[in-house]
């Protein structure tokens, strides 16, 4: 059966107090709307039809860029005359049969299992509503049942005292037979105080047509919470992060404090992984067995092999090229690994060392205050404190090659393109502009001069000019 998904995302989000469309505000590093679209794509939807309005062009451009493979379609609601009017805009894009699932673009945590169950409850024949049991249902429409059958949705302001005791609330999401949906939408009226077309009016139409109205319950309130303000967004972020932390810990990951953990992408972990507090993981991150992540690290798009230790305050950002850290490597504290860094087994990168677009073979070390850019570093190289590769000539980047067992003294500059042969030694303070032969000692610095009896200049103190009175 064909499944189309319609996502309402036209609202301005006034309470967000932001120029950005509400559905583009991020939860766990991805726009709210993207969470919903990704879930819909996971269901195998035939079409993902997003109804846009405020900031439509930005919303559409962003989603097409972020989800290039998804079966996206966009329709615009201009002006915005209610939820029923919104779904009416999707009618030309909908098929003639099957099921249409209607979701909200600012409700990002609906699980694929829940949406699948909702569509199954519809079965192309029934009107299925997604409901939830609430501790405080204030503001929600109540689900009034006659036995198991849904009889009506009663808004909070219209509910009787008895109906207000009902804890089952309507989430605003439903699954509808597509052919019936088109017919009911065509008959919507706006004879109400707001002069708007309400999607919920199709419930009465279904009952009048003898179509069964059923309900499927969400697993938790968190799953169906929407976002209308920065406070609600922050609260939902913490709920979502707590859920992700729980999943990881149930899989054996040791989080020292799950309340101080942020995952803004996808994280896969081997056995006996330990993660200290205030760490942020973005993009796609893989941690091998026995990896230890110290406090206050930020790691994005990286693969960290078994036994590696990432000390506190380390920043690893692979961007599009990624970063790889080999087995047993020691990184940090206060290290920075940038896109294209490929570190072999047992490599040491110490405090205030930056590595970009460079490979370092097994056992190479750069322990203090150094920069390696566009470099190939061989096994067991020792790269001294304060040393840098001068890889950029103002227009192009150039390669530095440091072969195995080279010792680079402190405060050296290697001006690329240049090759340091295997086993060579570079004296501290040298500026190397030519290739160095294997096994050679190369020293390129100004000669030290001593001046006997030299005295430092003394500061000249200006005399203050005085004024005489008369």
Where are the language model's segments positioned?
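N-terminal nucleotide-binding beta1-loop-alpha1 segment
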Residues: 1-18
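Conserved N-terminal catalytic core of the sugar/cofactor nucleotidyltransferase
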Residues: 2-4, 30-120, 463
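Short beta-strand/turn micro-motifs composed of small residues
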Residues: 9, 52, 104, 131-132
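Short catalytic helix/loop segments, enriched in acidic residues and glycine
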Residues: 19-35
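Conserved core of the sugar-phosphate nucleotidyltransferase
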Residues: 57, 110-193, 200, 211
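Conserved alpha/beta core of the MobA/IspD/sugar-nucleotide pyrophosphorylase nucleotidyltransferase superfamily
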Residues: 167-270
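Phosphate-binding active sites in nucleotide-utilizing proteins
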Residues: 265-302, 306-309
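Glycine-rich hexapeptide-repeat left-handed beta-helix
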Residues: 301, 307-470
């Amino acid at each position: 059966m064909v499944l189309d998904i319609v996502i309402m995302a036209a609202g301005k989000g006034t309470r967000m107090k932001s120029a950005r469309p509400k559905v583009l505000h991020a939860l766990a590093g991805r726009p709210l709307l993207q969470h919903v679209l990704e879930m819909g794509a996971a269901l195998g939807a035939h079409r993902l039809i997003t109804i846009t309005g405020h900031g439509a062009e930005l919303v559409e451009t962003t989603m097409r860029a972020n989800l290039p493979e998804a079966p996206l379609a966009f329709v615009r609601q201009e002006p915005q005359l209610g939820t029923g009017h919104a779904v009416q805009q999707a009618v030309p894009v909908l098929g003639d049969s099957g099921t249409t699932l209607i979701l909200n673009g600012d409700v990002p945590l609906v699980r694929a299992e829940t949406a699948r169950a909702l569509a199954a409850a519809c079965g192309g024949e029934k009107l299925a509503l997604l409901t939830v049991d609430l501790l405080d249902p204030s503001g929600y429409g109540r689900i009034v049942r006659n036995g198991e059958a849904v009889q009506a949705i009663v808004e909070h302001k219209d509910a009787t005292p008895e109906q207000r005791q009902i804890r089952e609330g309507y989430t605003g999401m439903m699954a509808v037979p597509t052919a019936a949906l088109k017919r009911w939408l065509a008959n919507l009226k706006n004879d109400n105080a707001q002069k708007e077309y309400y999607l919920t009016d199709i419930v009465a139409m279904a009952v009048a047509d003898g179509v069964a109205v059923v309900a499927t319950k969400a697993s938790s309130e968190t799953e169906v919470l929407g976002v209308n303000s920065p406070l609600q967004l922050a609260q939902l972020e913490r709920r979502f992060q707590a859920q992700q932390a729980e999943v990881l810990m149930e899989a054996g990951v040791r989080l020292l404090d799950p309340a101080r953990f942020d995952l803004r992408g996808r994280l896969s972990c081997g056995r006996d992984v330990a993660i200290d507090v205030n760490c942020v993981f973005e993009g796609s991150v893989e941690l091998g067995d026995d990896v230890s992540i110290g406090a206050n690290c930020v790691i994005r798009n990286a693969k960290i092999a078994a036994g590696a230790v990432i000390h506190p305050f380390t920043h690893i950002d692979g961007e599009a090229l990624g970063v790889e850290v080999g087995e047993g490597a020691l990184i940090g504290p206060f290290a920075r690994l940038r896109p294209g860094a490929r570190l072999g087994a047992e490599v040491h990168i110490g405090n205030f060392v930056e590595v970009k677009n460079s490979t370092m073979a097994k056992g190479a070390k750069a322990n203090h205050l150094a920069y390696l850019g566009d470099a190939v570093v061989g096994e067991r190289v020792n790269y001294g404190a304060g040393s840098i590769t001068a890889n950029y000539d103002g227009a192009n980047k150039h390669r530095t090659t440091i072969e195995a067992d080279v010792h680079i003294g402190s405060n050296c500059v290697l001006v690329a393109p240049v090759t340091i042969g295997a086993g060579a030694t570079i004296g501290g303070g040298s500026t190397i502009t030519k290739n160095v032969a294997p096994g050679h000692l190369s020293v390129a610095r100004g000669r030290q001069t001593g001046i006997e009896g030299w005295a430092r200049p003394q500061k000249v103190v200006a005399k203050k000019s005085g004024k005489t009175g008369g």
